[in-house]
Curated annotation (Swiss-Prot):
The protein's name in its UniProt record: RecBCD enzyme subunit RecD
Regulation (activators, inhibitors): In isolated subunit ATPase and 5'-3' helicase activity are inhibited by non-hydrolyzable ATP analogs and EDTA. After reacting with DNA bearing a Chi site the holoenzyme is disassembled and loses exonuclease activity, DNA unwinding and Chi-directed DNA cleavage; RecB remains complexed with ssDNA, which may prevent holoenzyme reassembly. High levels of Mg(2+) (13 mM MgCl(2+)) or incubation with DNase allow holoenzyme reassembly, suggesting it is DNA bound to RecB that prevents reassembly.
Record-linked NCBIfam families: PRK10875.1 (NF008127), recD (TIGR01447)
PANTHER family, per the entry: DNA HELICASE B (PTHR43788:SF6), DNA2/NAM7 HELICASE FAMILY MEMBER (PTHR43788)
Pfam families: AAA_19 (PF13245), RecD_N (PF21185), UvrD_C_2 (PF13538)
Length: 608
């Protein structure tokens, strides 16, 4: 009972959630107090995005869980956590259906353990080489990629994807991920020579799917494909939820192992946003013969929910290709492709390719220089970049009320074209397009520097400037931007989709740009959970790009403000970036890496 009291006190101090204590008492309330504590800490860490709880976090050392010290008197000094956990009916090695699984020195929730093994098996064992006519493939690639004296990593990535069942292509902004996939799909169709080749395109969010549709469409129009060949590439991408057949009001999906997807090739963009459970469900729904090509940026923020799947996969990218694979890729591309050393995680390494040249950001781009410096964790270089005369980046302080008002004025100017089109009652598609040109990004949800506070202040400020006209008894007004916060497959709206409230003669409706390019309007009363989105979190901005992005960092240090968060925000900007940040907060963020504890990288190398 003493431990239960300690756990409840931890809830009061917001060190645990009520859910964590409820889980611990339900599955291990009658067990040794140490097992109950481990269950609570495991549940807590899962809520923080971690896949497992290493036993080192339960031992009295510098890596121990912060709550451990306060509970030592209740559980006693344990000499062997592994022995204690396995003596419990709530824990097994995975050979019994227990709530918790101990695998090596890592403790898992049962479902997370199952998900992790599904993903590890897929990339380790299911992944295999595909036999190709190397002479024909080399000839096809030469026609699609210009001849170059230096190594063309886009061409290498295409060769990787065309010779493996599963491939992962990672690259920063402007490295040509979409161009690469357009060309490799063109090569695939040309080499299929009329054989069945059902291709599907998908991304985690509606915004990312719409961007993939637009950018891939542009890239494909530049390629030498016949009209018949072009028909074989889908005109639009869908969200992963839509692809898998999410059911209204249900967690069940239409497509799973018993009813797999009807496709031969699947391209998935923005793979860094895919959490471990979603990746597992996607893998379960794939037919045995399907090829899968994952695109993403390994340096971006990890998924909101548990895991950092793309990061764990790409942990082996720097190890390079095996010697045999490097020789094959050299033959296919006509240039020397360097080999790495060793054979660890060979199957996975031979399926990865990093795009290493940015075609968007040259040496004259402040955004590109800043993103690279942040990615290296080089605080001095970040400071130097801002001291140079780059015209596409600017840094502002937010130390006073005057600074805050100046930031609101700049936001008003940023949304200027949108507000002008709104006043001119332009067509909904033009208004939506204009809104997406500028975006305020926040690290936090609450407080004056968070999404909630900032959205309220912007609305008040715009009302004062007579740019919008809010009614006292309604949240709805002409031009209110909203973001969907919960999937509604019946309406075809998903988490992250953005709509604009407009009255076009039928009363106020909310207008959305759909992935297929069409515009759809919905009555406000029919919308699923949603929120105003003049400002959005950096997490929500993933999969989107804006001509001008403005990042606002809080005035105090907080664990969520990390290098990956700042890098992700900076790389949302296409042409201009505004950064509102205190020097100390920015430096601390760049020095702080996001940590997601999982066993996936270990499973790739050891095949446990």
């Amino acid at each position: 009972m003493k431990l239960q009291k300690q756990l409840l006190e931890a809830v009061e101090h917001k060190q645990l959630r009520p859910l964590d204590v409820q889980f611990a008492l339900t599955v291990a309330g009658d067990e040794h107090p140490a097992v109950t504590l481990a269950a609570a800490l495991l549940s807590h860490d899962a809520g923080e995005g971690h896949v497992c709880l290493p036993l080192s976090r339960l031992e009295n050392n510098e890596a121990s869980h912060p709550l451990l010290a306060t509970c030592v008197s209740e559980i006693g000094e344990l000499q062997n956590w592994e022995e204690c956990l396995l003596a419990s009916q709530a824990v097994s090695r995975g050979d019994e259906p227990t709530p918790m699984i101990l695998c090596g020195d890592r403790l898992y929730l049962n479902r997370m353990w199952c998900n992790e093994r599904t993903v590890a098996r897929f990339f380790n064992e299911v992944n295999h080489a595909i036999e190709v006519d190397e002479a024909l493939l080399a000839q096809t690639l030469d026609k699609l990629f210009p001849v170059s004296d230096e190594i063309n990593w886009q061409k290498v990535a295409a060769a990787v994807a065309l010779t493996r069942r599963i491939s992962v292509i990672s690259g920063g902004p402007g490295t040509g991920k979409t161009t690469t996939v357009a060309k490799l799909l063109a090569a695939l169709i040309q080499m299929a020579d009329g054989e069945r080749c059902r291709i599907r395109l998908a991304a985690p969010t509606g915004k990312a799917a719409a961007r993939l549709t637009e950018s891939l469409g542009k890239a494909l129009r530049q390629l030498p494909l016949t009209d018949e060949q072009k028909k074989r590439i889908p005109e639009d991408a869908s969200t992963l939820h839509r692809l898998l057949g999410a059911q209204p009001g249900s967690q069940r999906l239409r497509h799973h192992a018993g009813n797999p997807l009807h496709l031969d090739v699947l391209v998935v963009d923005e793979a860094s946003m895919i959490d471990l459970p979603m990746m597992s469900r996607l893998i379960d729904a794939l037919p045995d013969h399907a090829r899968v090509i994952f695109l993403g940026d390994r340096d971006q923020l990890a998924s909101v929910e548990a895991g950092a799947v793309l990061g764990d996969i790409c942990a082996y990218a720097n190890a390079g290709f095996t010697a045999e694979r490097a020789r094959q890729l050299s033959r296919l591309t006509g240039t020397h492709v360097p080999a790495g050393t060793g054979t660890e995680a060979a199957s996975l390494r031979d399926s990865l390719c990093l795009l290493q040249k940015s075609y968007r950001f040259g040496s004259d781009s402040g955004i590109g220089q800043l993103a690279a410096a942040i990615n290296r964790g080089d605080k001095t270089a970040v400071k130097t970049v801002f001291q140079q005369d780059f015209t596409d980046i600017e840094k502002r302080l937010l130390q006073s009320g005057e600074d805050y008002i100046a930031m609101l004025e700049e936001a008003l100017a940023g949304y200027g074209r949108y507000l002008d089109l709104l006043q001119a009652r332009a067509e909904p598609d033009l208004i939506i397009q204009a809104f997406n040109e500028y975006q305020l990004l926040c690290a936090l949800r609450e407080g004056p520097f968070g999404v909630a506070g900032l959205n309220e202040r912007i609305e008040q400020f715009m009302q004062q400037k007579r740019k919008i006209h809010r009614h006292p008894h309604s949240r709805w007004y002409e031009g209110r931007p909203v973001m969907i916060a919960r999937n509604d497959s019946a309406l075809g709206l998903f988490n992250g989709d953005i709509g604009i409230a407009l009255d076009r003669g039928q009363g106020t409706r909310v207008w959305f740009a759909m992935p297929d390019g069409n515009i759809k309007s919905v009555q406000p009363s029919r919308l699923p959970e949603h929120e105003t989105t003049w400002a959005m979190t950096v997490h929500k901005s993933q999969g989107s790009e804006f001509d001008h992005a403005a990042l606002i960092l809080p005035s105090q240090r907080t664990p969520v403000v990390t290098r990956e968060l700042v890098y992700t925000a900076v790389t949302r900007a296409r042409r201009r970036l505004s950064l509102y940040a205190d020097e100390r907060i920015l430096s601390a963020a760049i020095a702080t890496r996001t940590e997601r504890r999982s066993g996936l990288a270990a499973l790739f190398s050891s095949r446990e």
